[in-house]
């Protein structure tokens, strides 16, 4: 039987962007993961991680807790395929920093398998499969990050069951600064961050977030970064997670006074995104100085 080899790259992503909790994510080209798959059809299924390399490969499991392994199993199960799958993973996305690292690995894996087997499924199901794979790292499936890694650009999850996602057109390419704190990663960070979210939310806060989300999306589509940046505010999730990101609110206050377009937490944190449209070098220095002051 023929062994097929394919290598797939999946880029980092930033989920939520302020008010878009669990529905919005943006792919960025600052970091990426790569997965090389060697696939051979067989009577039995076996998935093996040969190696995990790259600057952020240390400590990543090779067993079923690896999102690539979990995603591959889910793909083969849904498509009723059986195969030997050998994986070589290159981790180029910082782990546990809110940049979609686990989701990118899962996304690259399912896209690779899709190109090998060419099953009759669409990208919505591919996103579902990758999200199921990410469950081993995050505790539950999160399609926002994987949708951005698979679709690219600005991805919107507009329906959950069945999952429906779309890549939104962006009329502008803003310059972005990432603040990545050099702190130890909390074990099961995403699960802990979700546990802080309130079960009940006042209607006023929901209305506020909906308005901000509309401004954020409209700004990107219309090419209006001031409008997009005005949408990067969240009255529900970010305040609830304040214990995990104590520096964020003080840093955001400082940066907004420097006329940056927008500031938000990347996913569950701790990384912070700063969006600017002009004076990029000055904003970069301001951001660095402000972060140092709060260190």
Please report, for each region that a protein language model flagged, where it lies by residue.
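Conserved small/polar residues in nucleotide/adenosyl-binding loops
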Residues: 286-291
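A short linear hydrophobic-aromatic micro-motif
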Residues: 258-264
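Short Gly/Ser/Thr- and Asp/Glu-enriched loop/turn motifs at secondary-structure junctions
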Residues: 143, 265-270
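ATP-dependent small-molecule kinase catalytic core of the GHMP/sugar-kinase superfamily
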Residues: 123-258, 278-282
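Short, conserved charged micro-motifs
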Residues: 44-46, 280-285
